[in-house]
Amino acid sequence: MDTPFSTLIRTASHEQHTEAETSTFMGDLLGGRLGVDAYARYTEQLWFVYRALEDAAKPLADDPVAGPFIQPELLRVPELERDLAHLRGPDWRETVSALPQTRAYAERVAECAASWPGGYVAHHYTRYLGDLSGGQIIRDKAEKTWGFARKGDGVRFYVFEGVSNPAAFKRHYRELLDAIAVDDLEKQRVVAECKAAFALNTGVFRGLGEEFRSAA
């Protein structure tokens, strides 16, 4: 395979990535047409997905395929829990709920984590590299729209304090992708799972869009 895997995976999933980024729900959220409750509900959905991702971090830490990607500075569940406590109050665990689309997403992540390290890498890539990039746009909009303190409670999910140079970190991550210890056929399967991951994420946005109809 002559094309670097990081390039292949980015190119192959471009269409699904664009569809996820341009969902009606996200457009309404970033456009200020939805209230803070919609933002909190989205944060709840993220918690379910990231819990599935990060519950697998320790078991997969020594795996030759997935292990190199598991880095403590990426972990988001503790930050999501701080955000949810701020958004929903100290008893947020009693009211938090997953949309059917979110359950399907989290279940697929857990399934890959349990039986297919390459598939886990696909989900890891689609989430964390997106958070380091487009997530910063969401943080900025949330701070301005709902008055959260800059990089404070409510938007901590988007703050990677352990990543001092995001551009360098993403470059290193792509180097890890290029060096992934799988053959070309497995790489094709990983690319297909990336597409599936974006589709699952788009499904979550669709579910949220049905729950929160824009007033626009």
Where are these regions (language model features)?
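Metal- and O2-centered redox machinery and metal/ROS homeostasis
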Residues: 1-216
